[in-house]
Amino acid sequence: MLFAFGDSYADTGNTKIAVTRSWHFPYGITFPGKPSGRFSDGFVSTDFVAGYLGMKTPIPYRWRKELSGRVKYGLNFAYGGTGVFDTLVAEPNMTTQIDFLQQLINDSVYTKRVLRTSVALVSLAGNDYSYYLETNGSAAAFPGFIQSVVNQLMVNMKRIHDLGVRKIGVMSLIPLGCTPQNTAGSSFQRCNETENDLVMLHNNLLLQAVNTLNQQTNSTLFFIIDLHNAFSTVFNGTEIHQGSPTFENPFEPCCFGVTEGFFCGSVDENGGKKYTLCSNPKTKLFWDGNHPTSEGWRAIYSTPAFQNTLKQFID
């Protein structure tokens, strides 16, 4: 059984239609052929992790009553745009997402016996940091804020474990300075290395936090899914496996707003498209300004960095 917590890198349809582009064309054009609430043209990380574990993708929490027969495979509590703290998105932060699981346990939807065989995927893709910058957080205080984010993430992971979930894998931050949102200013040619340095601080603190959790529980039940090195492998064009995709400029997205202020899926008051769309998403690592294509996720999933850390779910 798989539970997912976090943000748009894991969300498979929780975020409300009114507040997100992921329910609008052209999202979902590769799979399932229409918008599904995933922030991609197709699959996202949760789908690949579930496949690796030989499980069905857990349904979104908001559909638990309509698809009650699928609840036995786990649930996805992730909401796009959220963080460990509140962000600009009025959706449940990670603490509230864990509250949802707590309530289901209280209601006997999941028993302690069942939870002992379950695992959790935790995604933190950086929305807390975007919110900090957009609300004029100071550069000098940024490292301290990163520490507070990691501290809260550590609290959240410990709580998931205390509820009975057996193993918890948390994804490291990707090189955020290399996302199309941050490379657009250089015509998708150069990464923002200042931002990447802050990412490394987060990832180093996260490693320390996971080590501390394992020491406290005298176990190896907490681990990092190495999304950072997986992305770096793909960015650098390193051979992944025979038949693995080769992407055109990895910093350039398939779908992007025509000018600043517009995004993938944006339309004007007459319904006219205000974005450009590539002819074949399989040739692009990124779908939009921040999220990989389905083929991008497949490439990331196929890297040794990702595969080797996923093994800890079943070891």
Ranges and model annotations:
Residues 25-151, 155:
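Conserved SGNH/GDSL esterase-like catalytic core that processes O-acyl groups on lipids
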Residues 30-40, 85-89, 191-197, 283-294:
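Active-site rim elements
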Residues 50, 54, 102-106, 158-165, ...:
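Sec-exported extracytoplasmic/periplasmic mature domains
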Residues 1-5, 9-11, 46-47, 73-79, ...:
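Structural recognition of the beta-strand scaffold that forms the well-ordered cores
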Residues 1-67, 161, 287, 295, ...:
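Signal-peptide-cleavage-adjacent N-terminal segments of secreted and extracellular proteins
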Residues 1, 56, 72-73, 115-119, ...:
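Loop/turn elements at helix/coil->beta-strand transitions in domains of secreted/extracellular proteins
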Residues 19, 175-193, 208, 212-215, ...:
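Mobile gating loops/cap/lid regions near enzyme active sites that modulate substrate access
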Residues 124-238:
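Extracytoplasmic, non-cytosolic globular domains
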